Amino acid sequence: MAIININEVMIHLLPGQIIAGLDLGTKTIGIAVSDRGLIFSNPRSVLQRQKFTVDAQTLIKIFDHENVGVIIIGLPLNMNGSSGPRAQATRTFVRNMEAYTEIPFVFWDERLSTIAAERSLLEMDVSRAKRATRIDSAAAAFILQGALNRIHNLHHIEG
């Protein structure tokens, strides 16, 4: 497994593969996947965190089932752009995943993604109880959509 830059995503995808997005929290992991055209992100389940090995095995099953070729993972930087404990935990998580998968990861600045996801759910008039269960997958979809938009822009500039 490698850590790649956003501009390298397309060379790592095989035909038919999609991109996954992850929002890593202390208690849950939000999951989203792209469509086959790599245009739209779609929220999936929220994984309740357990031991790392259990989380890793569950994620790998999801990635295999969805035919994921690249994973975008939110990197929770501080507002000033510096790395704090949560960003370090995310980097450690990715390093630990090396034992479980060859799928490359891309770190994506996730500042304000949870706030944006919550606003989106509020605008859709989702109840407080449902928002609590959907916020992490909505944040993962928001992170993934930002990356998909960037990939699309890069492809149009280069292509």
UniProtKB/Swiss-Prot annotation:
CDD domains: YqgF. GO terms for molecular function: nuclease activity. This is Putative pre-16S rRNA nuclease. Gene3D superfamilies: YqgF/RNase H-like domain. It is an enzyme of class 3 (hydrolase). The keyword Cytoplasm applies. GO terms for cellular component: cytosol. Could be a nuclease involved in processing of the 5'-end of pre-16S rRNA.
